[in-house]
């Protein structure tokens, strides 16, 4: 992995499971167990220390996601890892399907209306269950449903631009 390659935060260690060095994870992938598909992991401890881990295995266990890190075999080691963030290189993710996007790829894109009015920059996205919402920060914050073709007309990564059909006063 190149040192300057973009990293994607996929989850974090939230606790220990049992006494044999298994970890409870919080995963932000969809489905949550997809986190195990993307490796190697770059893990960053709360202290800021980073390391690369290959060969992580895991499983769904009720409400929890359980992981086994190579070389971690006791609960004390796991307890010290609480809060550790899990990243992967952006290149570890498969290309999205046509007309699908990774949220992280949309962040920082400029947003303007079909009339050319600049609304701001994508701060982040969230899901409402029925659709995703793009949060745009400019002269003020706007929340625009990320729905094609009703509100979102185009996404152009080369131009760093999302064009929306949205009233700038709303």
From Swiss-Prot:
Q: Which cellular compartments is it found in?
A: Cytoplasm
Q: What is known of its domains?
A: The PRC barrel domain binds ribosomal protein uS19.
Domain PRC barrel stretches: 98-170
Tell me what organism the protein belongs to.
Xanthomonas oryzae pv. oryzae (strain KACC10331 / KXO85)
Which cysteines does the record link by disulfide bonds?
none
For this entry, list what GO says about its biological process.
ribosomal small subunit biogenesis; rRNA processing
UniProtKB keywords: Chaperone, Cytoplasm, Ribosome biogenesis, rRNA processing
Superkingdom of origin organism: Bacteria
Is Cytoplasm among the key words of this record? yes
Q: Give the primary localization class.
A: cytoplasm
Listed name of the protein:
Ribosome maturation factor RimM
Keyword S-adenosyl-L-methionine attributed: no
What does UniProt give as GO cellular component? cytoplasm; ribosome
Q: One matching Pfam family, short form? A: RimM
Describe the subunit structure.
Binds ribosomal protein uS19.
Which GO MF term does the entry hold, naming one?
ribosome binding
Which family does the entry's similarity section mention?
Belongs to the RimM family.
HAMAP family under this entry? Ribosome_mat_RimM
Main function: An accessory protein needed during the final step in the assembly of 30S ribosomal subunit, possibly for assembly of the head region. Essential for efficient processing of 16S rRNA. May be needed both before and after RbfA during the maturation of 16S rRNA. It has affinity for free ribosomal 30S subunits but not for 70S ribosomes.
């Amino acid at each position: 992995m190149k040192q300057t390659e973009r990293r994607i935060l996929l989850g974090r260690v939230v606790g220990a499971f049992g006494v044999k060095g298994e970890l409870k994870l919080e995963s932000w992938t969809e489905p949550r167990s997809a986190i195990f598909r993307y490796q190697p992991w770059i893990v960053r401890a709360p202290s800021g220390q980073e390391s690369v881990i290959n060969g992580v295995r895991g499983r769904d266990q009720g409400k929890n996601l359980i992981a086994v890190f190579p070389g971690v075999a006791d609960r004390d080691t796991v307890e010290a890892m609480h809060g550790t963030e899990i990243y992967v290189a952006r290149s570890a993710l498969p290309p999205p399907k046509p007309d699908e996007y990774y949220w992280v790829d949309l962040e920082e894109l400029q947003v303007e209306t079909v009339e050319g009015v600049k609304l701001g920059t994508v701060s982040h996205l969230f899901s409402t269950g029925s659709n995703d919402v793009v949060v745009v920060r400019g002269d003020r914050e706007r929340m625009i449903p990320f729905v094609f073709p009703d509100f979102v007309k185009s996404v152009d990564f080369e131009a760093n631009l999302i064009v929306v059909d949205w009233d700038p006063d709303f």
